[in-house]
Regions:
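Conserved N-terminal phosphate-binding loop of PLP-dependent enzymes in the Aspartate aminotransferase
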Residues: 1-347
């Protein structure tokens, strides 16, 4: 595309790359799943996508409140940051982050029925909490420490939203694009959100690209109401289409499910040990160790051995494994061996 001297930026104007991406996404991704969604290009990053979803949800429902979960991460611009629960991230805002209520995530208090808790907030006239326009969730809290929410929980949130006229927004920025074994991470629960946001891997080759998708009846935007210079990045659209073609041609979804079995078996046999908690799905896994200092030492040791890995979780004590979905089995095993060897040296 670069060698053809194709147009690079077109704002909101229709171009051949934009048309081809939208047609391909509609015909090969949405239609086979029976999904009917409007596709919006909100800007180049995930936080842009979240901002658009929040703005539209509030406009549709004419309510200010949004509910998010404790332990979540949705972005660093002010609207998305108001959802993000991490105090370190929120502290840089410099202003009050209002109109968001944070709900306990289901893993925080196993004895608490958090769906029932939310329903009580909605029905008890002394709860002191306003009805939200939307509830936004990640199906896997990645930055929160790789906590995988159960299908039953996701179904419960969907039912709650339906019952009380609340929009359900899924943040699929980090775990979409087959990361969990299905293209959209919410597919495993058999639910369909009212809106969802994608970025990161949807760019095909590390290109900045984001999508905000919503049911057609929610499309009440006025012209120019949510615009931005880099919404029309043509190279990102070309890369995104090429990435989707590769995923379909190489059956990446099925490969991720197969690799999940390899990773799970390896974890059980080589990584599991006293003081270590393992959790994950597809090709995203968390290995929780005693503290952030140990996790940092393990990450540094892995880096010395040729593996890049970051930390996650409240105390940065979770090793976050996100291997490339297209990694070969040999490459996958090499990375896992590096983690094993590094942990053995330090634990």
């Amino acid at each position: 595309y670069l060698m053809s001297d194709g147009i690079m930026h077109s704002m909101d104007m229709m171009t051949v790359p934009k048309k081809e991406f939208l047609q391909f996404f509609e015909e090969k991704v949405l239609q086979p799943r029976g999904l009917n969604f409007k596709v919006m290009f909100p800007g180049p990053t995930g936080t842009n996508g979240v901002e658009a979803a929040l703005k539209l949800a509030r406009k549709v429902k004419k309510r200010n409140q949004i509910w998010a979960l404790m332990g979540c991460f949705h972005g660093m611009t002010l609207g998305a940051l108001s959802l993000t629960s991490d105090a370190g991230s929120r502290g840089g805002a410099g202003v009050c982050l209002n109109d968001v209520t944070h709900i306990p995530a289901p893993y925080m208090f196993p004895e608490l029925d958090t769906i029932k808790y939310m329903e009580t907030l909605l029905t008890d006239d002394h709860s002191g909490v306003e009805k939200p326009a939307a509830i936004i969730i990640e199906t896997v809290q990645a930055e929160g420490g790789v906590h995988v929410f159960s299908n039953e929980y996701l179904q419960g949130v969907r039912a709650l939203c339906d019952k009380y006229d609340i929009l359900m927004i899924v943040d699929d920025i980090q775990v979409g694009c087959a990361r969990t074994g299905t293209f959209f991470s919410f597919e495993r629960a058999g639910i369909v959100p009212d809106m969802f946001v994608m970025s990161k891997s949807i760019g095909g080759y590390g290109m900045p690209f984001a999508l905000t998708m919503f049911k057609p009846e929610l499309d009440i935007w006025s012209p120019g109401e949510h615009n931005g210079t880099f919404r029309g990045n043509q190279l990102s659209m070309v890369a995104a289409k090429a990435g989707l073609e590769y995923m379909l041609d190489h059956k990446v979804e099925a490969e991720v499910k197969r690799k999940e079995g390899i990773i799970r078996k390896y974890m059980d046999e080589n990584i599991a040990r006293p003081g270590v908690e393992i959790r994950g799905i597809g090709c995203i896994w968390g290995v929780q160790v005693a503290d952030g200092k140990l996790a940092l030492a393990i990450c540094n040791k892995c880096f010395e051995k040729g593996l890049i890995m970051e930390r996650a979780g409240r105390d940065n004590n979770v090793l976050k494994l996100m291997p490339a979905l297209v990694a070969t089995d040999d490459e996958l095993m090499r990375g896992l061996d590096i983690i094993r060897d590094s942990m053995n040296e330090l634990m």
